[in-house]
Amino acid sequence: MYRSHVLVCGGTGCTSSGSQQIMETLKEEIKKAGLEKEVSVVQTGCHGLCALGPIMIVYPDASFYSMVKVEDIPEIVQEHLLKGRVVTRLLYQETVTPAGVKALIDTDFYKKQHRIALRNCGIINPEVIEEYIGTGGYAALGKVLTEMTPDD
């Protein structure tokens, strides 16, 4: 069981801004810090804030980092993942409040949205089909193949 999960956006906007390099560097720095058994790194689909990419979300505290650069990765690993101190200068500013960091879903951009196609973005690993199946993926296909007729 990992104590932290780092989600790196792999959507088109973030990829064009260098998220693949971010992910590679992040994995290297986590290994250097000896955290590979404590911190998982997962590439996700698009979160919808492409202009802020590359973006990264660190759980369990849901810290939302935006416009992350490769040069920022050692600081994120050392400060946030190793010492538990959020790197506030990299946080998406709308998530920063006097009471602390608010969840991304509570920001103006997200709070009126009802995600359908991307509802599992950041919840499941898109590269692990068992996680998709575990959230009901392919249930409609199963119903069509086992319960319905061509006339249905």
Where are these regions (language model features)?
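Feature of Fe-S/electron-transfer and energy-metabolism proteins
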Residues: 1-152
